[in-house]
Design a protein with these regions (language model features):
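GIY-YIG nuclease catalytic motif and its immediate N-terminal context
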Residues: 1-43, 47-50, 58-68, 72, ...
Length: 94
């Protein structure tokens, strides 16, 4: 069994959401069905990043860290580098 830390991006708003889940697909569906108070106003959501952990405690610790200001800066830097690198390599897919 894996435990997941994930990042959702609102399709219509400039918002990110960081969460924890045991069943990642089910949890994303719950977000997009409006079943989460925190994400309901910013529907729909798409997953842009996730990490899998074998240990629940490690996953929850990572989620908590990414929600701090320091963790948020790290996450934004990682995402920026990832999307920049994939954008600059998109010509390789043609």
């Amino acid at each position: 069994m894996f435990y997941y830390v994930y990042v959702l991006k609102s399709v219509n708003y400039n918002r990110l959401y960081i969460g924890f889940a045991v069943d990642l697909n089910k949890r994303i569906k719950e977000h997009n069905c409006g079943l989460s108070f925190s994400t309901k106003p910013y529907l729909p959501w798409q997953i842009i990043f996730f990490e899998a952990y074998k240990n629940e405690r490690d996953a929850k610790r990572r989620e908590k860290y990414l929600k701090t200001s320091q963790g948020g800066r790290l996450l934004k830097r990682m995402l920026k580098e990832y999307f920049y690198n994939n954008k600059s390599n998109s010509h390789c897919l043609a």
